[in-house]
């Protein structure tokens, strides 16, 4: 009888422990870290923006952390896949947290450019090269997949690769060697400091959402660090990406479709801030009529881009916006349409409102306002006015701290002495 009672007590205790263990497991916060490839998603057939959406929908998190600085969040444009994830979150009533962080007191890339010219770098780079050549994990990776440069150049590796063990083990070893040789500094863009600061923001999101499902989207080179840090937290259940496979196909919302196709990020910006309206539309125009080289050589802008830009501006105007930025863009489009007198008329309407243009972008708006006006005057045979506009452009470059060598080569060139013609830029 006593043995029977003892057995009952023992079984009860075992069941109790199992129940407690199961309850504790259920109350853990599930966290999945997803490595992304930033601009690479735009033309990677195996890791597209749609794949980002499929990953989000398959995991269906309660909370989404995105690699956007808090100061930029819902106010300025940032990494496209992070904005897509934000829009997905807002469209589906998810909490979205910005978790990016950068050191603002120094320019690590400028530091690195100077440092790689020193003798100290030459010595340490040889040490780093030796460590890489003798690292079995890194060499096995290169034999299997090729160099990292070739991987990024070909841009065909999929989401399983960037979220798999081989890639993340390689990145871990790469940063371990870099920090061992150079320290946590400009050569690795202060990666340890940045990752630690980002983890602080991630931990805030976790603390405010205990027991929930959280997805962290971050550049693929951060994933190894976050996985290691999160695996050490008792209240966190780190989710393996492989458990999501195969992914579901998620139908995008109209906001996401509009953003992927036309860069019009509706649903992302905080529209209670009236200035966000201008940011929404102006950012949509950037890839259309202000892409690489387009402002310096407008002849490379496709006609289809101009057509799309006209549509964006028309919608912007329907918001009853009277912003100087809108008028700047309208004048630029008129110039692209070869309506030079129309462009001059619009430009002159904001000559006394240039201070209303975004101060952080005066180096662009003010400088190109005068340069573009000079173009229009030259195209309408008003040479004296054109020269004055180019002089104002040069003056603005100096005042706003634009590199004068760059300005002379790409912006105002020699237009004070040689009139601008559309043909010369072809």
Show where each model-derived region lies.
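Residue-level recognition of tetratricopeptide repeat
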Residues: 332, 368-371, 375-378
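Flexible helix-coil transition and linker loops at the boundaries of alpha-helical arrays
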Residues: 257, 265-276, 313-320, 352-363
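Proline-aspartate-enriched helix->loop->beta-strand connector
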Residues: 56, 60-66, 211
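Boundary/linker segments of alpha-helical solenoid repeat arrays
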Residues: 318, 323-326, 354-366, 395-422
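TPR-repeat structural position
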Residues: 299, 303-306, 340, 383
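A substrate-binding/cap region within the structured catalytic cores of diverse enzymes
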Residues: 74-183, 324-329, 336, 340-341, ...
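TPR/TPR-like (Sel1-like) alpha-helical repeat modules
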Residues: 348-352, 383-401
